[in-house]
Amino acid sequence: MLRADGTNIVKLWVDGSYTMHPDMRSQTGGTMSLGKGAIISTSIKQKMNTKTSTETELIAADDLMPHILWTNYLLNWQGYNSKDTILYQDNKSAILLEKNGKKSSSKRTNHIAIRNYFITDRFKADELNIEYCPMGDMVADYFTRPLQGKKFYQFRKEIMNLKD
């Protein structure tokens, strides 16, 4: 059963898996929760090739921004006022770019198109926070790469709010 955990915090785990497909495209995966179980989960092939894993992660977050905004608008319209929206990612370089925008680009990331910095505007407007999530705890890995054994069952349990 899906339910909110009472903290009024919308949490979204986003991950990009670099060059997963034969055509060298990357994979975006994400899951959103109000505490107990996922309210939105997605896994999509990215529409463009990327040069770095940082760019893959930035595009993954950009791909899921409409889901974040729409869900927050729907929740507010239904009377559920969230205190915070937190986006979790496991790539510190992508987090830096998302928070600071183009000005924190280096020679490895200055080619990234400005359209992928929509998330920076949302961060600066205080519509969401961006936090680091260690790779071993990244629930979105469930949607971007093949998992085996313990991790598969751990993430499935979190996403579906299953009991032991």
Question: What are the language-model segments listed below?
Answer:
Residues 1-14, 80:
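Structured nucleic-acid-interacting core domains from mobile-element enzymes and related host factors
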